[in-house]
Amino acid sequence: YALRSGEQKDIAIAIGEQYQTVPQTKIGLVVALADRIDSLVGLFAAGLAPTGAKDPFGLRRAAIGVVQPLIEHNIDFDLAEAVKKSAKTQPIKVDDEVQTQILEFISGRLSVVLKDMGYKHDVVEAVLAEQSANPAASAEAVKQLSTWVKRDDWSSILPAFARCVRITRDQKQTFKVDEKLLSDKEEKDLYKALQAVSGQPSNVNEFLEIVVKLTPAINLFFDKVLVMAEDKKVKENRLGLLQKISSLSNGIADLSKLEGF
């Protein structure tokens, strides 16, 4: 019908592709994503989100239709920004709480898709805890992390990082590190090792390669240094050092979700 009405061939193809789970052309993908995100945002805002087994408007299918093509085409796409922009075009108000619900719903479908691809539950959840708003990036992170957890030396890599996280995660304050307060050799060595690999990693491989380099210094630090020192400033300085290491995983993966953490 589109061709008969005088539309260009690529436009006609895109119109047909918007109903496919994974459109093959860029125009078809753009149309499909816009349609599916608009449906999700509008219906959630209207209070018509799926409940239990009931999904009369096919929103679970729509969410899968958002994440699957982005993964298969490996397209960098910010779902949070897309939902925010779509919310502004709706005839009814879409507040921040509803937008969060939409993103959590899509994340749930993304989790299903990744597990159906054969990835382990804990690996998927570790990644989605930090970067569920970008399906293609999430899929690549899950792929990378899946390789790491199968390594022979994983049993020494994960515990080293876990020690840093466990002792700092309940701290309500982020402490700065004052090099002048570093007194023990092992804490100085750990600080120097961290400085040598300074810079926030951008993916799983970069992050865990840093942890590998830090692991010997981390283990020596915990073996020789009393983190909870009586001197408040020294204690907070040491906690700050470990917080810096723990924060390396921010935006990449929450390793506390992994088996054996």
Model-derived segments and spans:
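Amphipathic alpha-helical "coupling" segments that flank catalytic cores
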Residues: 1-261
